[in-house]
Amino acid sequence: RIPNLELISLHKGEGEAQINGIDFDLTTLGHNFDAGQDAFLDTVAVMMNCDLIITSDTAVAHLAGAIGRQTWLVLKQIPYWVWMLDRTDSPWYPTMTLYRQKYRGDWVDVFDTIEQDLSSWLKQKEEVK
């Protein structure tokens, strides 16, 4: 648990049930979130009010990068080609930091690193206030 942190799920559609039973607080925006002809407009509006987006390789990652939001992207060991290999940055999205699996299927190191970086990032934000 990290103090002074609110987590908001931008997930929609299939797979929403995967977040049931998690053991931490998470704000969900409901099954009608960003539905219909204007898909992704609501997502952009929410993102513009977030200090940081943490996501996997989904449309949300590309959207966050395209609108210039600070984004931390978690990637499997062998990612989609656009993320290249052996980089922690993206030439397409300068506000994005890449967190990569070292071993296939092992997310422990990735999320341990994110937890440490997030704690440091939040501490820096508090010092600026």
Task: Write out the residue ranges for each language-model feature.
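Catalytic machinery of carbohydrate-active enzymes
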Residues: 1-129
